[in-house]
C-alpha cells in the first residue's frame, strides 16, 4: 500500500501518538501552519506535512524517530519538518504566550501556534493554499487587526512583503 499523500487530523494525531510512544526522553514540539489548524479543528482539508516551528531537542536529533513513525504509519518521510523555521521571525516575540497545548503523548509535548499567529503566517506566505486556508477559516475582524498590527515590524525587515500583506488585507476586507 502506498503512503497517503496528505495528512488528515486523525492521521496526524495517530502519528504524534506513535512518536510519543517511541520516544524515551522528553520531546517538545510547536506546530504551525495547516497542521496547527487541523489539530485545533479550525481546518478540515488535509495537509502535506506538519510544520515544526520549534523543537526540543533539535528536530535533526529526532529524524530517525520521525522516519520510523513515517514507515509505521505509512506517512511521507517528511511528515514532520522544520521548513517553516526560516520564517519564525514573522511571529511576534510574544507568540509563546498564545500557544495551545495538546494533551501529552507520553513524553511528547505538542503545542500549536494560536489561530491568530497561523493567520499571520498565512497572510505572510500568500501562496494559493494559504489564501485557500484563509478563505476556509474566515479570519475574524480582530484576527485581521492583529495581522495589520504586525506589518510595521515585518516591514522593517521586509518592506515589499509587508506592502503585499497590506494590499492583500485591503482587498480581503473590501470583500
Predicted features and spans:
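Compositionally biased terminal segments of proteins
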Residues: 1-175
Amino acid at each position: 500500500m502506498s503512503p497517503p499523500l496528505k495528512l488528515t487530523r486523525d492521521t496526524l494525531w495517530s502519528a504524534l501518538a506513535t512518536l510519543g510512544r517511541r520516544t524515551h526522553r522528553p520531546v517538545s514540539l510547536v506546530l504551525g501552519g495547516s497542521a496547527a489548524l487541523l489539530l485545533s479543528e479550525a481546518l478540515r482539508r488535509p495537509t502535506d506535512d506538519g510544520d515544526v516551528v520549534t523543537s526540543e531537542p533539535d528536530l535533526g536529533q529526532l529524524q530517525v524517530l520521525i522516519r520510523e513513525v513515517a514507515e509505521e504509519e505509512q506517512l511521507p518521510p517528511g511528515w514532520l519538518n522544520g521548513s517553516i523555521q526560516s520564517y519564525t521571525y514573522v511571529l511576534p516575540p510574544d507568540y509563546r504566550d498564545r500557544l495551545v497545548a495538546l494533551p501529552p503523548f507520553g513524553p511528547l509535548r505538542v503545542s500549536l501556534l494560536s489561530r491568530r499567529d497561523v493567520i499571520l503566517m498565512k497572510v505572510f506566505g500568500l501562496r494559493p493554499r494559504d489564501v485557500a486556508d484563509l478563505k476556509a477559516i474566515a479570519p475574524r475582524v480582530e484576527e485581521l487587526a492583529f495581522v495589520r498590527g504586525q506589518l510595521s515590524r515585518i516591514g522593517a525587515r521586509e518592506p515589499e512583503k509587508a506592502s503585499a500583506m497590506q494590499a492583500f488585507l485591503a482587498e480581503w476586507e473590501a470583500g
